[in-house]
């Protein structure tokens, strides 16, 4: 199977600063591929190189069978892009935004007339077709941005932080719409800071930091290999003495702020020891992708 996207030994520098460092990526048709990393990891620069908007210092890139940046305009005709921030035209209605974008891709009036009603239905905006963009909620604008990115029936949909700033209801509706695209065979490249989003949608992940790949695999494989046990979060006062006492019951422990994390393969003894402890609260849960991300990239704030 021919990959829709390939990067081989791609490097990008700004001055003497290495932003992307010999990065390899490969996205197969039908995948939802998650590109994860903290702020400053190189995700945005990677996307810009893939689209031919900035040139790598070295390495090779292929997008939809086209070499990048040499044939980036041709490749972009087969790609849909959902940017991190909406760039809809506020002077036009919902339906006009879709029609105008269709013309950018050279679609005929007949093609636009056929596709627009289906995209309005996909975005659940049929009743708001004539509404002005400025009158839409944030969730509606985001759904319209996704629908607009599909106007050219792209081989690859690139989504940069697709649900940032949305409330939980709007976020779940976007997830449901994206799952319907994946069920229909679409290919998605996704960046996100919501680990739940990546765990729900992606069937393959790559974690980068400081421009380098530090982990890759399926979400459940990364959770098993990097964490491999349950997590008990403990909140309260005087956690250090509790840590000293209960550490033998855990594979490892970690203190961050006012939370003590126990990583345990057999949680029952630890839970029994915590039961009835005054001044503490605790939560026992399975390990998740956020645990993996924080283990790999650290818990320090990134600007």
Swiss-Prot record:
Keyword Transport included in the entry's annotation: yes
Domain ABC transporter residue range list: 5-235
Class in the EC hierarchy, top level: translocase
Subcellular location: Cell inner membrane
EC number, as in UniProt: 7.6.2.-
PROSITE patterns for this protein: ABC_TRANSPORTER_1, ABC_TRANSPORTER_2, NODI
Broad class of where this protein is predominantly found: membrane
GO MF annotation, one: ATP hydrolysis activity
Keywords: ATP-binding, Cell inner membrane, Cell membrane, Membrane, Nodulation, Nucleotide-binding, Translocase, Transport
Binding site for ATP: 37-44
Entry GO CC: plasma membrane
CDD domains: ABC_subfamily_A
Membrane topology according to the record: Peripheral membrane protein
InterPro entries given in the database record: AAA+_ATPase, ABC_transporter-like_ATP-bd, ABC_transporter-like_CS, ABC_transporter_ATP-binding, ABC_transptNodI, P-loop_NTPase
Oligomer and partners: The complex is composed of two ATP-binding proteins (NodI) and two transmembrane proteins (NodJ).
Family of this protein: Belongs to the ABC transporter superfamily. Lipooligosaccharide exporter (TC 3.A.1.102) family.
Biological function: Part of the ABC transporter complex NodIJ involved in the export of the nodulation factors (Nod factors), the bacterial signal molecules that induce symbiosis and subsequent nodulation induction. Nod factors are LCO (lipo-chitin oligosaccharide), a modified beta-1,4-linked N-acetylglucosamine oligosaccharide. This subunit is responsible for energy coupling to the transport system.
Stated name of the protein: Nod factor export ATP-binding protein I
Species of the source: Cupriavidus metallidurans (strain ATCC 43123 / DSM 2839 / NBRC 102507 / CH34)
Gene expressing this chain: nodI
């Amino acid at each position: 199977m021919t990959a829709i996207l390939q990067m081989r030994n791609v490097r990008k520098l700004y001055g003497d600063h290495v932003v992307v460092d010999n990065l390899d990526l490969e996205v197969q048709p039908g995948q939802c591929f998650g590109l994860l990393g903290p702020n400053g990891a190189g995700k945005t620069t990677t996307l810009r190189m893939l689209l031919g908007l900035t040139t790598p210092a070295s390495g090779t890139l292929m997008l939809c069978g086209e070499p990048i940046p040499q044939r980036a305009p041709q490749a972009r005709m087969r790609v849909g892009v959902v940017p991190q921030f909406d760039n809809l035209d506020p002077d036009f209605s919902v339906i006009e935004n879709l029609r105008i974008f269709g013309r950018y891709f050279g679609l005929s009036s007949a093609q636009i007339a056929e596709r627009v009603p289906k995209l309005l239905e996909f975005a659940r905006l049929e009743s708001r077709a004539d509404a002005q963009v400025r009158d839409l909620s944030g969730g509606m604008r985001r759904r319209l941005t996704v629908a607009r990115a599909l106007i050219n029936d792209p081989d690859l949909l690139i989504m940069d932080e697709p649900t940032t700033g949305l409330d939980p209801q709007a976020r779940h509706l976007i997830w449901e719409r994206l799952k319907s695209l994946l069920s229909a065979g679409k290919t998605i490249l996704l960046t996100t800071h919501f680990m739940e989003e990546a765990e729900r949608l992606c069937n393959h992940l790559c974690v980068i930091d400081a421009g380098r790949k530090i982990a890759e695999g399926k979400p459940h494989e990364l959770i098993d290999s990097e964490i491999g046990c349950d997590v008990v979060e403990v909140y309260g006062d005087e956690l250090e003495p509790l840590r000293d006492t209960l550490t033998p019951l855990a594979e490892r422990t970690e203190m961050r702020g006012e939370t003590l994390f126990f990583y345990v393969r057999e949680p029952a003894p630890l839970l029994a020891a915590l039961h009835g402890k005054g001044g503490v609260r605790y939560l026992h849960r399975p390990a998740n992708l956020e645990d993996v991300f924080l283990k790999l990239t650290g818990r320090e704030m990134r600007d």
